[in-house]
Curated annotation (Swiss-Prot):
Transmembrane spans: none
Sample GO molecular function, one term: phosphopantetheine binding
Protein name: Anthracycline acyl carrier protein DauA
Top-rank taxon, per record: Bacteria
Residue intervals of the Carrier domain: 3-80
Length: 84
């Protein structure tokens, strides 16, 4: 079973930001995507990358409630476990 790690999410977010710097996710459970400089388009690019890489569909209506990298990680991994 594939699982998305915090390091993998961090790299995907870096690619979505289009920057060389990797976002600091030391406080991944409290820092928001907005705090990290990810606008809605960058978050959507992150989601699309995860869907392509992990072969899982992430419902947009549920994603709208996710504000932090930690919640994204939990959400994605729950979907990955359910897909098995």
């Amino acid at each position: 079973m594939a699982e998305l790690s915090l390091a993998e999410l961090r790299e995907i977010m870096r690619q979505s930001l289009g920057e060389d710097e990797v976002p600091d996710l030391a406080d991944a459970d409290t820092v928001t995507f907005e705090d990290l400089g990810l606008d809605s388009l960058a978050v959507l690019e992150t989601v699309n990358h995860i869907e392509r890489t992990y072969g899982v569909k992430l419902p947009e209506e549920e994603l709208a409630e996710i504000r932090t990298p930690h919640s994204m990680l939990i959400f994605v991994n729950e979907r990955l476990r359910a897909a098995v």
